[in-house]
Amino acid sequence: MGIIFFSLFEKLLQATGRSLYSTIGQVAGAVVNIILDPIMIYGIGPVPEMGVQGAAYATVIGQVVSAVLLFIFHIKLNKEFEHGAKYMKPDAGIIKEIYAIGLPAIIAQALMSIMVYVMNLILKFSPSAQTAYGLFYKVQQFVLFLAFGLRDAITPIIAFAYGMGSKKRIKDGIKYGLMYTSVLMIFGILITEIFPSSFATLFNAGSSREYFIGAMRIISISFIFAGINVAYQGIYQALDGGMESLIISLLRQLVIILPLAGIFSIFVRKGRAGVSLIWWAFPITELAACLIGFVFLKKIQKIKVERLTH
């Protein structure tokens, strides 16, 4: 239950531009979890040894701590919100608007799991390639979390500007959001391209080391396009473009990447190419989605931004 309220109050604080307090709540829960893990797993002091069950308890307690802290921040700081039982009455119009924007994000999360599962099936012919992909996926998520963070920052800013009817602020939010995201992604590319061996050692790639390094050198090229796609999705959501956000998610994680990787794997299994051919499916997919995303952005700007008067 803690994660439900944690997520709710975290987003309410982010929506009012109080991301610092959102971060404090997250960190507090994580610290409590880290402290309680060894205590409850191995049994320290009056706490009995609980093993894996103890780790689960520590996680739940950490989530509850975060939820309570974020709730306090929300009540004390988010004066923009009015609270009361009368606001608990379901409103079909509001629910529809919430799902119009939120459903694409829900589907995107589900697609991520589906993509990883199917990619592992595609790579089934090579256990080393499977392992390399699994390890690199962790590195990729670490880099893309930078883009996710900026997306969460620019979405409320652009949404505020859109609600105010400020064309200049919307354009500034889009410009700087894309620019800063690109800078961070270029940094991510440089780090992964220059130090692939260090990452292989860090993640204990073992016999999959060469596959891991090969995957990193090729797939990391896609970071710049992937980061921009993530930013695009935040911009679309801020401008009430949930469908465009959903389409980009489908292109990136299902429609292009999986058929392309599947086709490339046929050539690899027949000995006509190396496993590296499959890794090229990632940059190609992100570039294609990025180009389509740019078209969507121009369309949304023309329809929803250019008509604004100030």
Model regions and ranges:
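Hydrophobic faces of transmembrane alpha-helices in multi-pass small-molecule transporters and flippases
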Residues: 20-27, 69-72, 87-118, 123, ...
